[in-house]
């Protein structure tokens, strides 16, 4: 059972390639995450959602809008944009 948000960033070396967000709620976060990433020039190239442990797990594969790698400062900015969205679910439900 998912009792608190779980966020797992997938990297290939220094490059951020995907994020997986698990939450208690069954309300998808893709809309909020997409808006935050779009502001950074990032897109979601693939999305999967599955029910798990009474909640929802979303897997998002990321890419730069103009091509190239998501690494360094851009990787840190993407993570910083995603984490508050995932953690906000816990605050509003808790």
Question: Where in the sequence are the language-model features?
Answer:
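Regulatory modules associated with amino-acid/nitrogen control
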Residues: 1-94
């Amino acid at each position: 059972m998912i009792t608190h948000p779980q966020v797992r960033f997938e990297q290939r070396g220094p490059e951020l390639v995907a994020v997986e967000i698990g939450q208690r709620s069954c309300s998808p976060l893709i809309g909020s995450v997409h808006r935050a990433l779009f502001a950074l020039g990032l897109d979601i190239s693939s999305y999967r959602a599955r029910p798990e442990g009474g909640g929802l797990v979303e897997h998002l594969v990321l890419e730069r809008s103009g091509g190239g790698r998501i690494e360094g400062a851009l990787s840190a900015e993407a993570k910083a944009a995603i984490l508050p969205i995932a953690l906000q679910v816990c605050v509003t439900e808790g």
